[in-house]
Amino acid sequence: CVPPTDAQSNFNLVNDGLFVPLKIASDKLNRLRGEEGPPAGARQAEAEIRQVVGANAHGQPVLDLIFLGLGEDGHVASLAPDEPESMMSDPAVYRGVHNFAKPPPQRITIGYQTIAAARQVWMLASGTGKEQAFRDSLAPGGKTSFARVLRLRSQTKIFTDIAV
């Protein structure tokens, strides 16, 4: 969990690379409040989403699109590949993450069930060092976070430059 202007902030990366160039007004953006810490930031993010997005029959907000990137270890969002598989059924929309392997160690992540409920999920798997994680994710019985997302959804669009 870092402030939105920190170099490790996903919001900072997307804001500078996408939102600012496209002139998307800041009042149209809902960002994770990592600077408030994992529990408080996760609660606030869930409350904000529930105010603007309808829920499915299981109580999960139905987002139009979730765009994920693949980490070198096969993680997506901040869902670690070494988490117990039981986390796939956790109904938390957002939750705190502690001791994540890649800095920063404290994070806020969207939950598997919320990803599963989205109308569309797009995955970007690109770049050096991600080839093995990508192949492991596509293999039957894959153990990566991305493999878990694929098992939860009937369709996920994958954008990649990795030869399969």
Role assignments for model-derived ranges:
Residues 1-65:
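Ligand-binding beta-strand-loop-alpha-helix segment within the catalytic cores
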Residues 66-113:
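Class I SAM-dependent methyltransferase SAM-binding "motif I" and its flanking Rossmann-like core
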Residues 51-58, 110-113, 146-148:
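A generic local secondary-structure boundary/capping motif
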Residues 22-23, 86-88, 113-118, 150-154:
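Short, conserved loop/helix-junction motifs that constitute active-site signature segments
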